[in-house]
Amino acid sequence: MKLQKPKGTADLLPAETAKWQYIEEIARGVFNDYNFKEIRTPMFESYELFSRATGETSDIVTKEMYDFEDKGGRHIALRPEGTASAVRAYIENKLYAPEVVKPVKLWYDAPMFRYERPQSGRLRQFHQFGVECLGLKNSAVDVEIIAMADTLFRQLGISGVKLSLNTLGDMESRKAYRQALIDYLTPFENQLSEDSRRRLNENPLRVLDSKEAEDIAIVKNAPAILDYLNETSKAYFEEVKALLEALNIEYTIDSNMVRGLDYYNDTIFEFIVNFDGKELTVCGGGRYDGLVEYFDGPATPAFGFGLGIERLLMIAEKQEINFIPEETLDVYIAVMGEKANLEATKLAESLREQAFKVERDFSNRKLGAQFKTAEKLGAELIITLGEDEVRTGQIKVKHNQTRKQVETTLKAVHESFAPIFEEIYADEIN
């Protein structure tokens, strides 16, 4: 039997993980600058958590969820998105308590799972950065989080990212719009896709999110949510737009945008990149003021987003952005003879304890072969250990490029390698 990774998954080998680590480091720094704290939640949760959060009629629930019954008879699902888990953790751990500073700002970097047809930028196991800000409703919160995503793109050097913006209004506005949408779509019912016919009376906003050609043609002339906003929702959206303009963040209004999840209200947004002639959403989110209360927590306004890491990397590669820092090694220890093996092990550990990155030879090869390995690893310095060096305690530390070398002792290296390191690089520093 030939063992292979499951369809829709990917192995991340060292050359790839270096890119991931770079992006994660940048993202962690941006989130920290905005005072967000990391949260980690289980990869699997109760099926009901996700089905209730994302909506029984959503594609996630009806087509994409990985769910199963465990050995205890519990209905379990692999996490398809991060917000529901963050909200569950917020409630279960009583982060709504008065002694907890509001808003509660959380971020995560986690794998998600959806049973989709694998294609470019869409895997069955994929990874997202997510942020959730819970406890305050203020247009400035919405804009700060949108600005944070914009900052991350800029720090990564990603260009051509466009912000698409819409509002779903409050409950009163959505109710009025829902009826207007039903009235508009009903005459076209027989022309809609099977999924959209099913959703027409259950959740007509879902029809706007359809990717089927027949649905896209029909909703093109559908009424816009912006025409059904009450005064409160209008004023809130105007505040959001004004704050974005104050920060010089350009945006376009997409009145048909609804996002793929049921819990949103008021501000929703997507960051979109043109990729091979198609629009690719790399980040999306919005406000979800009713979700905490829906799960029996206290009324809690909230705002957040999810950002696809694989898509981010795909865009960066297309734009020829190199996320791989140059790999270097501080010291390579060339080892000659069995008697030097013990000393090489001790020396390598000593240097690592002094915060130097070290590799050594384990194969007792010829020196020429070891030096070639040092070259491939990008070693800056080489220490050669043979029987003579072990017997006398005298060694030479050689720069692999300039060939400059310093004679010293094993004892001195064990005590403090930093002065020796600095001596070798003294000419370059001066």
From Swiss-Prot:
One of its GO terms (cellular component) is cytoplasm. Its EC number is 6.1.1.21. PROSITE patterns: AA_TRNA_LIGASE_II. It catalyses: tRNA(His) + L-histidine + ATP = L-histidyl-tRNA(His) + AMP + diphosphate + H(+). Keywords: Aminoacyl-tRNA synthetase, ATP-binding, Cytoplasm, Ligase, Nucleotide-binding, Protein biosynthesis. CDD domains: HisRS-like_core, HisRS_anticodon. It holds the Pfam family HGTP_anticodon. It is an enzyme of class 6 (ligase). GO terms for molecular function: ATP binding; catalytic activity, acting on a protein; histidine-tRNA ligase activity; transferase activity. It is found in: Cytoplasm. One of its GO terms (biological process) is histidyl-tRNA aminoacylation. SUPFAM superfamilies: Class II aaRS ABD-related, Class II aaRS and biotin synthetases. Homodimer. Belongs to the class-II aminoacyl-tRNA synthetase family. This is Histidine--tRNA ligase. It comes from Lactococcus lactis subsp. cremoris (strain SK11).
